[in-house]
Swiss-Prot record:
EC number(s) given by UniProt: 7.1.1.2
Organism listed in the record: Fratercula corniculata
UniProt GO cellular component terms: mitochondrial membrane
Reaction catalysis annotation: a ubiquinone + NADH + 5 H(+)(in) = a ubiquinol + NAD(+) + 4 H(+)(out)
Membrane topology qualifier: Multi-pass membrane protein
Transmembrane segments: 1-21, 27-47, 48-68, 88-108, 139-159
Record carries keyword rRNA-binding: no
Cell compartments where the protein resides: Mitochondrion membrane
InterPro entries linked: ComplexI_Subunit6, NADH_UbQ/plastoQ_OxRdtase_su6, Nuo/plastoQ_OxRdtase_6_NuoJ
PANTHER family registered for this protein in UniProt: NADH UBIQUINONE OXIDOREDUCTASE SUBUNIT ND6, NADH-UBIQUINONE OXIDOREDUCTASE CHAIN 6
Any one Pfam family match given in the protein's UniProt record, by short name: Oxidored_q3
Name of this protein: NADH-ubiquinone oxidoreductase chain 6
Length: 173
């Protein structure tokens, strides 16, 4: 099980690296799907199946709509793939920043700084919230409505910003 969780964490980091290395949106969506599947699988291995399913459906549903709009707006005849030198340079730079962060984080952990939780004994000592399903339906409703409204507003703002002389996705008829 430990190897499976390490594999999922590696897939999560590689998926995030695939999105952040700035290839064309055609390839970025593959990294997004990889990262979200790995993150939800990680939550599933911790026993939080409902939260994993909700995050998978909401995140992929919302972000894939944004990627569809960005693919429609970025109609490149020759899209950048992960093998291009500029994208490889971004990937190497991000991996370098990750390694420096891990080294600095390791030194800080040796100095006993950082966050200490109640169950901080090992890697799998996580206090699970068994009332998370009830919190989604009781206290979380208002926050979900605010977040949904904010995402809808952000979508229209981005579409209006990239429109450019009535040649974008929102056209005056």
């Amino acid at each position: 099980m430990t190897y499976f969780v390490f594999f999922l964490s590696l897939c999560f980091v590689l998926g995030g690296l695939a999105v952040a290395s700035n290839p064309s949106p055609y390839y970025g969506v593959v990294g997004l799907v990889l990262a979200s599947v790995a993150g939800c699988g990680w939550l599933l291995s911790l026993g939080v199946s409902f939260v994993s399913l909700v995050l998978f459906m909401v995140y992929l549903g919302g972000m894939l709509v944004v990627f569809v709009y960005s693919v429609a707006l970025a109609a490149d005849p020759f899209p950048e793939a992960w093998g291009d030198w500029r994208v490889v340079g971004y990937g190497v730079g991000f991996v370098g920043v990750l390694v420096v962060g891990l080294v600095v984080g390791g030194f800080i952990e040796c100095l006993n700084f950082g966050v200490v939780t109640v169950d901080s004994v090992g890697m799998f000592s996580v206090r699970l919230d068994f009332s998370g399903v009830a919190m989604f339906y009781s206290c979380g409703v208002g926050m979900f409505l605010v977040a949904g409204w904010g995402l809808l507003l952000t979508l229209f703002v981005v579409l209006e910003l990239v429109r450019g002389l009535s040649r974008g996705a929102i056209r005056a008829v």
